[in-house]
Amino acid sequence: MIKVAKAVVLITCLGAILAVTVPASASQAMHRNRTIRIGSCQISGRFATCEASGSVNNPIRIKVHVKAVPNQRFSGNWSMVCSKRNGAASSSGTVSGLTPRVKELRMPFASPDSCDVAAIASLNGRGSLHVYLTARVP
């Protein structure tokens, strides 16, 4: 009877350890990707304009962030050139709206080896403008 009770306690403890360990290791595998800032600019004034640019290796996704104080309308555009193996391709587009604004940029192909990115934005009035680029990487 005592051996059965010890076995039940041992199995219960082992189950509790596995219940904590397995989700933790699965969680670590899911969170290996991280977001990094690859370019930034800040400026103040009437119709303030600034350009953020940068390079990134193995991006999963790239975003442009536009913030202003006070919040207001803005317009801008972005472009990128990415390489993969022996080839290269580009993509570009516009970004506009009301700050704060975050826009995911369309990469020219999936899983590029590297990308060079630039984004420019201009305020429609007076204020402080902050434009920055982020990338999700492995």
Where are these regions (language model features)?
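Post-signal peptide N-terminal regions of Sec-secreted extracellular proteins
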Residues: 27-138
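Secretory targeting and sorting signals
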Residues: 1-27
